[in-house]
């Protein structure tokens, strides 16, 4: 195919000015070959197919200054600030990546004047359409023929047909183009052969000054970027949504296809054209300006020309409204997710769906799309390593072409792109090694933590196998619900994208109603709104007994009332007492009131600890009603990030974690007169640590009393731990329970429980049913199946069927559902309550006659492979089984149906549950105990000591984070970390934010990580919610994505309707705002100033890396990573902002691993390898090119010997300190000895040795 030069050449006026004495004639402007993508492909080959021709010609006015006008592309409406135009030839300077910039300047203020040394007298108006400043290397035009040859080959027939329409317009200029071309090349040869160059100039910058004075208008320096996919193999089939690099909120989707920073050009030899320009003239990084990743309200207001249109288009896109049902579901799930979590952060429930992660169907769809992109034309699959080889081949071809151009004389030199390389970004070789602190004496290997004590008697038993396999009914119902939701979506058009296209909108009345319910005012008392106490309703009587008695009369009918005086007498006579009473006997609500009435609150307060949040709150509410006082006045409660107490509080209910943290500030707990450890039989992690601490408090304070309550018969163990203290038994008000076992093991315990409940409802006398399940998914599946089968039964049965009221019970029970549980059902309906193990002891429900025990429960177990605590299903213990059966005998003779065999009860169940301290991670516990000046943790008085390896490994984790020094003591960083109620890595991240001057941003990220996911993903709006979420993506980091979400919410005045428009959990965001406020108060107490890093979010990524460098992974394959230290494979999750970008970072750190179908990294952030070496020197080091491995080994040996010397010095100091203390004690005793004078004693002697005895 011939070369058609008429498409790109333009007629220019002659300029007879001189430059250095040499005439400067008019030059043609050629369009350079496009820059290569990160994978070495032509990143804009497809984009150029449909580019329209530039209209008009350049006009050369006669003036001396060059005016450079930066007009903004439609793609980016924000202002370009911070541009630095030098007066001399500039080189590409690396600037840090910036994500957000705000500016209030208008477009008219964006013009700047550049005066160039030795400039000609012409004034050239240049209007680049990219967001960049002008570089010295601009696009040249000397290779236009080659470029047009490429364009001709890549043009489609349609674009060629369109191009022919303009041929006549160019016909008149054709001869002038050819003449200009001949004149230009002739002059170029003459000038090149002449000796006009000065010694200060070289071939490298030859023509650069010429270029800056040449007419290279719109065609030479800019292009119109079209929303077309990149041709790289990673993005060949990607949708525009999948490639969002810097999403703009409220921006039409057609303008959101900007390239990812990861998809920019790789360092490769790029030709410098005859004019001295390089391809990357329009790069935004030269001037310090980079892609904005967040929608700026001020920036939008400045672009008045486009703002109205964009707002209208953005409004059209977000016309999908949240229905009332979806809003209720959103608030319900938000409450449930927040109050479900324990006091710890790193807890993953493998069976619970995560809002952030999405459902299985969408994840499989995304993974399938990614797999398709890596299939060759012949059908064979291509790994990422092979994809890189293919990309390198293209890069080599490009270099070959550049060499040919060099030989032909069309270009004068090559420039190696250094746009993404700075001095510190050179290729780093990361060496991995393990350094052990000397205080552990080599007794620990961080990556191979010993297996924790598993709470299962026989892993090969039937119950253990069934618990690992899970329920088939749950999966079946999940798929059925998903199918139903997708069917409904077709005719639920109002508010959907299709509805917007067809013009189907909600009525004004519906919109007003939704807005009234959601609320559009963000400036509310978020602290008060977030408190659970504001939502709890007054408890209503359910049983006939409760409805017929007043609250005072009900108190007198409780079993504990009959032994009130004897109990108080035992408390007066003993400092520690163990109280045993069945659940429902009144010990939790009445014991604290009895102590208050007996005068124990005159000189202090009565504290009562609970293992669960909901128990602490609901019990405090009940006691405040019985004492007829407001909650928060005399009666209060305190849980993590929520304190509802006041100066008049005399009875305080709290979680055991809250009391544990109070021991840090007041080791003797001086403000407490009595502490009641309620539900001690559950043996939570904090409870066991409190036992050891309170045992020392009892020894120091003789006026302090400790009461331990338990619902089971293992009270003798508590009594022995505190020194054989008395045990007081409260007589129970129980009725006989008939226990029925299953004849064969149940393969699907959820389906068996549903069938048993239906059988009871049809055949048994009146009485409510209680079903014990393991978790949220199973409870919802059981409720769905029960409802479905009841509808079938009512429709198919000829006789009247009693209604069945199905109610779930979660540990995070929302306030509205809590009222339903205790309300009496209407029309004589039977209640069927589906509950977790919270109903074993923490909640008492009247009217239960039938209990269905599945025999399973979820327990928190440390998973060393994942490196975190996870909720897993295990068979329950015999003690828990007896406790469940006892729930049927509270109001009358009951029946317990056990869905396992009697043999399994006797042989496959443990006698009592394994304490949590023996099966979980101990990082926080070790930090707390160290702060209490307990040096030797292995000698701490635990009731059930955890495995020694667990303690040592937790100490090693803290040493890695810098909380412990080389000799095992707390560092300054460690002392500060203790003050924050956070996991150690999050506390480290927060304090590193202070050191790096970005604590404002890190504080927001930590707050967002401390609450459940803020993304709401209704199944019937899955695609819309995914699209809305992608607008917030920051391609380098999921952590920065969370920061972006919070900042956008803040910019929109914390509005609730804005959250609904963008599928965000408004309650979750408000909870994050409350947590942020709590942490901010702690920072003020520590006198830490709140500083922000502004738009430079690279510093924030470094702070994140400082906390999670031990969870680092390097790239290996298609979206597959391996842990840098263990080699364990882990994958980017399809919901991650880093997923499917086309270029994935070489190194990432992640918050935690989630084990589902694969090991997925949750909350990943890209990091630089030298950050890992700088922040985690005990694991990583960078191999310098001028050092050998032998030198590295010598250096490691020196560091190790230095730590050993430090440890040896500490031991010597300890020995000397002990000798000095013994000497002081000896002298003190000598002074105290009395000098007694008597018969036979030498005067002044201190020894009673009579002389007459010859002694």
Curated annotation (Swiss-Prot):
Q: Where is this motif: Nuclear localization signal?
A: 144-153, 172-191
* Polar residues bias spans: 109-137
Q: What is this protein called?
A: Pre-mRNA-splicing factor ATP-dependent RNA helicase DEAH7
Q: Which terms in the Gene Ontology molecular function aspect does this entry carry?
A: ATP binding; ATP hydrolysis activity; nucleic acid binding; RNA helicase activity
Query: From what organism does this protein derive?
Result: Arabidopsis thaliana
**What reactions does this protein catalyze?**
ATP + H2O = ADP + phosphate + H(+)
> Which lineage do the record's taxonomy fields give for this organism?
Eukaryota, Viridiplantae, Streptophyta, Embryophyta, Tracheophyta
Residues noted as binding ATP in the record, renumbered to the chain:
581-588
GO biological process entries:
defense response to fungus; embryo development ending in seed dormancy; gene expression; innate immune response; mRNA splicing, via spliceosome; positive regulation of protein-containing complex assembly; positive regulation of RNA splicing; primary miRNA processing
């Amino acid at each position: 195919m011939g070369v058609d030069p008429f498409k790109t050449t333009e007629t220019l006026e002659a300029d007879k000015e001189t430059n250095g004495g040499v005439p400067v004639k008019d030059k043609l402007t050629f369009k350079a070959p496009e820059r290569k993508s990160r994978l070495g492909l032509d990143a804009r080959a497809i984009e150029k197919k449909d580019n329209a021709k530039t209209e008009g010609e350049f006009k050369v006015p006669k003036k001396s200054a060059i005016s450079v006008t930066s007009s903004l592309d439609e793609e980016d409406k924000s202002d370009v600030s911070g541009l630095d135009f030098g007066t001399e030839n500039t080189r590409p300077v690396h600037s840090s990546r910036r994500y957000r910039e705000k500016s209030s300047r208008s477009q008219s203020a964006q013009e700047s004047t550049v005066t160039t040394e030795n400039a000609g007298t012409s004034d050239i108006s240049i209007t680049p359409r990219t967001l960049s400043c002008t570089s010295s290397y601009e696009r040249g035009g000397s290779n236009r023929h080659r470029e047009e040859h490429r364009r001709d080959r890549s043009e489609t027939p349609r674009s060629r047909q369109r191009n022919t329409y303009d041929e006549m317009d160019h016909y008149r200029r054709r001869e002038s183009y050819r003449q200009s071309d001949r004149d230009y090349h002739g002059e170029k040869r003459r000038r090149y052969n002449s000796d006009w160059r000065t010694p200060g100039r070289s071939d490298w910058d030859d023509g650069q000054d010429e270029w800056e004075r040449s007419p290279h208008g719109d065609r030479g320096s800019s292009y119109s970027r079209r929303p077309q996919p990149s041709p790289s193999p990673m993005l060949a089939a990607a949708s525009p949504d999948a490639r969002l690099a810097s999403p703009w909120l409220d921006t039409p989707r057609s303008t959101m296809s900007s390239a990812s920073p990861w998809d920019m050009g790789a360092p490769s030899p790029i030709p410098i054209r005859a004019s001295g320009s390089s391809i990357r003239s329009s790069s935004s990084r030269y001037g310090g300006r980079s892609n904005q990743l967040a929608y700026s309200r001020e920036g939008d207001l400045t672009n008045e020309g486009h703002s109205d249109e964009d707002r209208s288009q953005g409004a059209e896109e977000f016309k999908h409204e949240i229905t009332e049902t979806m809003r209720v579901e959103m608030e319900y799930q938000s409450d449930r997710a927040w109050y479900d979590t324990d006091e710890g952060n790193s807890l993953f429930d493998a069976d619970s769906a995560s809002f952030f992660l999405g459902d299985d169907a969408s994840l499989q769809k995304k993974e399938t799309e990614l797999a398709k992109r890596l299939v060759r034309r012949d059908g064979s699959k291509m790994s990422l390593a092979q994809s890189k080889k293919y990309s390198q081949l293209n890069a080599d071809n490009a270099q070959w072409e550049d060499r040919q151009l060099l030989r032909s004389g069309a270009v004068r030199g090559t420039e190696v792109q250094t746009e993404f390389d700075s001095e510190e970004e050179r290729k780093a070789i990361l060496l991995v090694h393990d350094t052990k602190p000397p205080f552990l004496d080599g007794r620990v290997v961080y990556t191979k933590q010993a297996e924790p004590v598993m709470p299962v008697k026989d892993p090969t038993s039937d119950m253990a196998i069934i618990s690992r396999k899970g329920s088939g009914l749950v999966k079946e119902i999940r798929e059925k619900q998903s199918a139903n939701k997708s069917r409904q979506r077709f005719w639920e058009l109002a508010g959907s994208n299709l509805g917007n296209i067809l013009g189907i909108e909600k009525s004004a009345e519906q919109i007003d109603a939704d807005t009234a319910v959601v609320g559009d005012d963000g400036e509310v008392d978020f602290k008060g709104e977030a408190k659970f106490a504001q939502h709890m309703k007054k408890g209503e009587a359910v049983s006939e007994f409760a409805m017929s008695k007043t609250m005072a009369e009900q108190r007198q009918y409780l079993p504990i009332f009959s032994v009130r005086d004897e109990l108080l007498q035992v408390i007066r006579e003993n400092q520690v007492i163990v109280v045993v009473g069945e659940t429902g006997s009144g010990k939790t609500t009445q014991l604290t009131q009895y102590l208050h009435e007996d005068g124990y609150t005159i000189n202090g307060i009565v504290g009562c600890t609970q293992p669960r949040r909901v128990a602490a709150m609901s019990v405090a509410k009940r006691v405040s009603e019985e004492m007829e006082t407001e909650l928060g006045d005399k009666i209060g409660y305190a849980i993590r990030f929520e304190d509802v107490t006041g100066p008049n509080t005399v009875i305080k209910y709290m979680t055991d974690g809250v009391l544990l943290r109070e021991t840090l500030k007041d080791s003797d707990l001086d403000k407490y007169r009595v502490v009641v450890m309620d539900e001690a039989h559950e043996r939570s992690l904090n409870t066991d640590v409190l036992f050891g601490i309170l045992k020392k408090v009892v020894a120091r304070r003789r006026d302090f009393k400790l009461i331990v309550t338990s619902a089971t018969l293992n009270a003798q163990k508590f009594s022995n731990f505190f020194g054989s203290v008395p045990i007081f038994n409260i007589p129970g008000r129980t009725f006989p329970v008939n226990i029925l076992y299953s004849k064969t093991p149940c393969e699907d315990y959820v389906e068996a429980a549903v069938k048993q409940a239906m059988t009871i409802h049809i055949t048994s006398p009146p009485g409510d049913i209680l079903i014990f399940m393991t978790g949220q998914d199973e409870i919802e599946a059981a409720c769905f199946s029960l409802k479905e089968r009841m509808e079938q039964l009512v429709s198919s049965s000829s006789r009247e069927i009693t209604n069945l009221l199905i109610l779930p019970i979660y540990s995070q029970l929302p306030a509205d559902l809590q009222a339903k549980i205790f309300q009496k059902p209407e029309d004589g309906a039977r209640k069927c309550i589906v509950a977790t193990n919270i109903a074993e002891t923490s909640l008492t429900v009247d009217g239960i006659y039938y209990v269905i025990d599945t025999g399973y429960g979820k327990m928190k177990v440390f998973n060393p492979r994942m490196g975190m605590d996870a909720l897993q299903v295990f068979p329950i213990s015999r003690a828990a089984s007896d406790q469940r059966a006892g729930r049927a005998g509270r109001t009358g003779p009951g029946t317990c149906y056990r869905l396992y065999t009697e043999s399994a009860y006797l042989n496959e169940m443990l006698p009592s549950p394994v304490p949590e301290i023996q099966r979980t991670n101990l990082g926080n516990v070790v930090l707390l105990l160290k702060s209490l000046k307990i040096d030797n943790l292995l000698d701490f008085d635990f009731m059930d000591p955890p495995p020694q390896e667990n303690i040592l490994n937790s100490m090693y984790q803290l040493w890695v984070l810098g909380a412990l020094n080389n000799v095992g003591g707390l560092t300054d960083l460690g002392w500060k970390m203790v003050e924050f109620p956070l996991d150690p890595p999050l506390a480290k991240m927060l304090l590193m934010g202070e050191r790096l001057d970005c604590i404002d941003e890190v504080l927001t990220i930590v707050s967002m990580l401390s609450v459940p996911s803020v993304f709401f993903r209704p199944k019937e709006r899955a695609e819309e919610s995914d699209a809305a979420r992608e607008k917030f993506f920051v391609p380098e980091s999921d952590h920065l994505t969370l920061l972006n979400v919070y900042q956008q919410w803040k910019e929109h005045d914390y509005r609730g309707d804005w959250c609904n428009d963008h599928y965000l959990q408004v309650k979750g965001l408000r909870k994050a705002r409350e947590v942020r406020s709590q942490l901010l108060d702690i920072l003020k107490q520590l006198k830490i100033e709140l500083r922000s890093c502004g738009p430079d979010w690279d510093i924030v990524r470094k702070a994140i890396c400082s906390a999670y460098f031990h969870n680092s992974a390097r790239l290996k394959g298609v979206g597959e990573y391996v842990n840098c230290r263990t080699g364990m494979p882990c994958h980017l999750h399809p919901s991650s902002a880093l997923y499917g970008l086309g270029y994935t970072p070489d190194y990432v750190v992640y918050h935690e691993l989630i084990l589902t179908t694969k090991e997925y990294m949750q909350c990943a952030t890209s990091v630089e390898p030298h950050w890992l070496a700088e922040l985690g020197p005990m694991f990583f080091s960078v191999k310098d090119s001028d050092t050998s491995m032998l030198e590295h080994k010598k250096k490691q040996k020196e560091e190790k010997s230095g730590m050993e010397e430090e440890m040896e010095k500490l031991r010597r100091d300890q020995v000397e300190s002990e000798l000095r203390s013994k000497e002081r004690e000896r002298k003190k005793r000598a002074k105290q000895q009395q000098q007694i004078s008597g018969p036979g004693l030498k005067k002044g002697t201190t020894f009673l040795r009579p002389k007459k005895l010859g002694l």
